[in-house]
């Protein structure tokens, strides 16, 4: 190592995580922060969650590729903690290249990334259909079964594609197991070995130029003084360990997963930005203490909840499913802040609250008459929570596009001030619209 390399100040690493049940608006914020980053890293999840970006009025939905791909010159990394569908990846690459973006030269995929295969999708969909009314709400894209194979030590990884004979042997062994489950237990059709083998090996040459030792590359980039942004998918309350289990996703969505899922030392994570919507949403099944509206539940049809859904355009960017809506839950937010070690919050979609006569904030719960100030663990306990609210005056003025704190309506400032008091960490950013420039900056995560 040269003397000059020793003296380079390492770059800063910022982790962006959702503090709710996903859909907090992480994609826009990652894109905004990428002005100060030379690389963006996905470290968990798969193509089951979409990040929606509005840039210059044009809508782009990214499911697998990091949001930094929208910025020319920014490197994008898919870490070992991700589960990768080659079919979904190349579909997304094609869409981006059609839009005029260079992708393959800037995308780096960990050789240790787990592959999603056709039998994972088949099992995922067959299981969900079999559950009927007890469904979890999976997207049916094979994410969970792929993670099961990873934990069961039978997963096929990206690097396995480059040894055709070994890949074929392991695929045959896996199909023996999974086809038994599909046909004998789930009542589905078997997945064909040869067709699967041909399809997967067909991706090998296309993937190979993008495959690398991502962990080593991130280490070298950081020590060369380059800033890195770690982009989480889903949200803390969907985390496999810390969420409302079993109504959760199949990976760890918390900030600590950035270290394990990208192969970086945890002490290298300098700042954790918690993305928090100014109200709450949830897709699919599971408890939701502050819920106002659920399109599928006749008993949850509060007009304010309907307004939040309509004004906020609360439909899944990947599935198109309507999201359930409710007031911001600060007791759940506190749980997320503690788990993630959040340095500061970014409040998104504040403008959706414009025009309401009053705004409520859930500050705790009652369970059997007892006060509870933190979201309990596990779905059964969360389902027993009765929300305790504080009520604030609403504001009639539009907050859309406001880019300074002082320009916000007084009641909006009062609401946000109380949120950060209850949360115990500062609000460092506020998003007042979907476009990049519709952002209030109070403290910059890369400059704190």
UniProtKB/Swiss-Prot annotation:
Membrane among the record's keywords?
Answer: no
GO MF annotations for this entry? adenylosuccinate synthase activity; GTP binding; magnesium ion binding
Pathway, per Swiss-Prot/TrEMBL? Answer: Purine metabolism; AMP biosynthesis via de novo pathway; AMP from IMP: step 1/2
Which residues participate directly in catalysis? 23 (proton acceptor), 51 (proton donor)
UniProt: GTP binding residues? 22-28, 50-52, 323, 349-351, 431-433
Q: Which GO terms describe its biological process?
A: 'de novo' AMP biosynthetic process; IMP metabolic process
Q: Which cofactor does it need?
A: Mg(2+)
Q: Give the catalysed reaction(s), semicolon-separated.
A: IMP + L-aspartate + GTP = N(6)-(1,2-dicarboxyethyl)-AMP + GDP + phosphate + 2 H(+)
Q: Which residues bind IMP?
A: 23-26, 48-51, 139, 153, 234, 249, 321
InterPro entries recorded: Adenylosuccin_syn_GTP-bd, Adenylosuccin_syn_Lys_AS, Adenylosuccinate_synth_dom1, Adenylosuccinate_synth_dom2, Adenylosuccinate_synth_dom3, Adenylosuccinate_synthetase, P-loop_NTPase
Q: Its Enzyme Commission number? A: 6.3.4.4
Which residues hold Mg(2+)?
A: 23, 50
**UniProt GO cellular component terms:** cytoplasm
Main subcellular localization, coarse class?
Answer: cytoplasm
Sorted alphabetically, the keyword list is: Cytoplasm, GTP-binding, Ligase, Magnesium, Metal-binding, Nucleotide-binding, Purine biosynthesis
Compartmental location: Cytoplasm
* Cofactor binding notes: Binds 1 Mg(2+) ion per subunit.
| HAMAP family linked | Adenylosucc_synth (MF_00011)
Subunit info here reads:
Homodimer.
- Family, as annotated: Belongs to the adenylosuccinate synthetase family.
Q: What does this protein do?
A: Plays an important role in the de novo pathway of purine nucleotide biosynthesis. Catalyzes the first committed step in the biosynthesis of AMP from IMP.
Q: What is this protein called?
A: Adenylosuccinate synthetase
Lineage here is: Bacteria, Pseudomonadati, Pseudomonadota, Betaproteobacteria, Burkholderiales
